[in-house]
Amino acid sequence: MDNLILPRSFKVLDNNCALVGAPPNLFHACDTDGDLQADTREIIEDTFSEEGVLEHGANGLYWGMDNTINVSEHNWHLKISEDGFYTSPIHWRGQWLISQDDSGRIYRNVNSNPLHVDYISPDYYARNFNLIRTTGNYYNLIDQSEAEIWPIRPTPGLNRAYRAQALREDGSASYYGGTSSPMIFRGDRLPEEIQGQPLVVDSPTNLIHLLKLEDDGAGNLYADDFYDRGEIIASTDERFRPVHMVPSWDGTFYIIDMYRGVSQDYPYQTNYLKNYIEEHGLADHRGLGRVY
């Protein structure tokens, strides 16, 4: 598919087809003759995010165990019937990407809150949008005040690093700068104690943070930092910007590194960050992203 503007979501389907989210459209595109080009392109929905908005808007397309294709930061998710795809209304939840555990619970996050869980399917609350409280849906598993990150380099290039107490004495951030892409590790090629545990990326601080889930025995989950003081992956390179993690077929997982100096969407950049970017030439050298 060519001439897409800011495509932000992609889901491979059978029969050489795929779902492609390119605001404002969600396409169902198929390669009918095997030349790796989309010969057919059907618009399933024309309300998939807004053009020109990078940081906010529909994304995800995570295929859950209940056959729902979950969408984050949007007011519907996608379902399939004998007649094709259709949307189902939900409450607006999450910011960037989605994961699921072995029990089918859906996880999201937002900004500096690393992990939320749906104990209850959002379909039930969507039956009555007049409900004020939606307990059990998008439940916050760890408070910001209880979570700490440990970058291995000073991180002055944060959007609000000018604030008092934003940085430690060594110049590193103590809390998330912009967490996204929660992933429950469900593979078998990492140590057993990590299996079933959540990881989140925090590209502004150049790291991937490992959390641990605990169950109180009554089905209530809580999250905590896996390491008292440390990270599973961290870099001294300011351009290391992990933005996504994907489970791999071989029991490991892939890391998508945007590898660029700027990680904050321009309309939301503070004057402090704009000056920092200009002083350090961080807007230069684009198109160097990589996969681990």
Predicted features and spans:
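Beta-propeller domains with acidic blade repeats across secreted/periplasmic ectodomains
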Residues: 1-292
